[in-house]
Amino acid sequence: MLQDYLTLRQAYLTRPDTRTQIHQNYVRNLFLYETFRLGGHNLPPTIFENIVSTGKPQSTETTRQAYDLWQAWQYCEKQAALRQPLDLTFVRAVSARIMKHTGGETTTSVGRYDTSLGDFRLGEDYDEVYPLADFRKIPLLLDNLCRTTDVQLTEAGVSENIKIVANFMYDF
């Protein structure tokens, strides 16, 4: 009996460590879920986890939005592995994936845009009376920010990259 225990223990100690991948998946899913909740969605975590693990949305709009977020995350992971640069094309591709099932064509007084294709909004957001941003300046400002951030990301280490990405989110 002791010999069986020692054999089992040795097999346990020499097995590959899979806990790190499980923990990374948990942290990733928790990050995505909290990001989804920041968007004002109230989806139970078990349903969100089911969408991520199966890769299939349910028939409600909220679950399709969660699925789109998951698909956008997978796209970002693939592009990061390929070391694709951060530019407007990448931002539009991610935007199109996030809005794939719930976006659509919108017509404003200044033109048409389709959020499901990753188009930028043609219209202004207002805070009470004053506009928050001039929509015509957004593509140029975003392009400049992408180029600056891309240069910083290639020159920085892993811990600095987190700060750079956080600054990117804050600046834009």
Q: What are the residue ranges of the model-derived segments?
A:
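FIC/Doc superfamily catalytic core
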Residues: 1-172
